[in-house]
Amino acid sequence: MIYADVIIDISHEKLDRDFQYRVPEELEQSIKPGVVVTVPFGKGNTVRKGYVIGISTEAKYDASRTKEIQGVS
């Protein structure tokens, strides 16, 4: 399993950090730092634009609660 560290495109001081998302198998070849992605964000899973800033093979958080990248923009 591959995970991407993503900065969400929202201006808010509490969101000034990265969030980790699972990378679906079909997108593994496309995901790299600098790529723009669409991700579900927040309790309502609102679709937001984000920027990949890093890739990892280990989850920083509980992998079962990690959301999945929806697509590449």
Residue ranges and their predicted role:
Residues 1-73:
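Terminal, basic amphipathic appendages of nucleotide-handling enzymes
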